[in-house]
Design a protein with these regions (language model features):
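Conserved beta/loop motifs at nucleotide-recognition and modification sites
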Residues: 1-235
Length: 235
């Protein structure tokens, strides 16, 4: 049994910009760390560059390297938008024809901010072609659970249920913002103890009711400075 070859084109789609961005970062890192790597990485705005221009870039032979990486944002959404007409249809047809034939050194990454349908022709092509790869990055249904898992896996720190729920209430499905807040909270507690709801209230713009609760808790446990910070947030 032969292994599937390394993909030459990828479709990363979905609302989870954080995890999607991490997947793109891994492909960047795979280009190597020498000075030639940046010479073989190009980025395009799919609303500006044409499919022909993008294909020309990704099929250009790499300079002193064995790979060329081209990253394109929102191309498919642009080609299939309302009003794209014959130009959009022609662009999709061009991609369907050319993507399976990309040379082995090509690494084309199509990034879409919205989740694509399983019936999308290019998604189906990426999933069925030996040289294609498609992955959806949907926002988790349980943001509180995601925050707790992220804190443990990425920062080796615990965040209690109420703190995670409070943070999830503030950040919603914006996982990038949630992760940024986790970094702040990790530094705030110096990685020495679990993150509490009072910590979230002290550092994060938060619902007033929770700030009041956290302030009372801080006063009751002798944390006067933290209680004062929370009082200023309420004023």
């Amino acid at each position: 049994m032969t292994n599937k070859p390394t993909p030459t084109f990828y479709i990363f789609h979905g609302e989870d910009s954080l995890t999607r961005g991490e997947a793109v970062k891994k492909l960047r890192e795979a280009m190597g760390g020498d000075s030639n790597a940046d010479l073989n990485i190009s980025e395009f705005d799919g609303q500006v560059a044409s499919p022909a221009e993008i294909i020309n870039a990704v099929t250009s032979y790499p300079f002193l390297s064995d790979k060329r990486l081209v990253i394109v944002k929102d191309l498919l959404a642009w080609l299939t938008r309302k009003g794209a007409g014959a130009v959009g249809k022609k662009g999709i047809e061009h991609l369907l024809e050319v993507l399976p034939t990309l040379p082995d050194y090509s690494r084309l990454v199509l990034i879409e901010r919205e989740t694509l349908s399983d019936k999308d022709k290019l998604v189906q092509l990426a999933e069925s072609s030996p040289n294609g790869y498609s992955k959806g990055f949907t926002a988790p249904k349980d943001a509180t659970g995601w925050i707790q898992k992220r804190a443990q896996a990425e920062y080796n720190i615990q965040i209690d249920n109420r703190a995670a729920a409070a943070l999830a209430e503030v950040t919603g499905d914006d996982l990038q913002r949630a992760d940024n807040e986790l970094v702040k909270l990790f530094n705030y507690v110096a990685g020495e103890r679990p993150i509490t709801e009072a910590d979230v209230a002290a550092l994060t713009p938060y619902v007033p009711e929770a700030n009041i609760f956290a302030m009372i808790d801080a006063l009751a446990t002798g944390r006067g400075q933290q209680a004062l910070q929370l009082l200023h947030r309420l004023m």
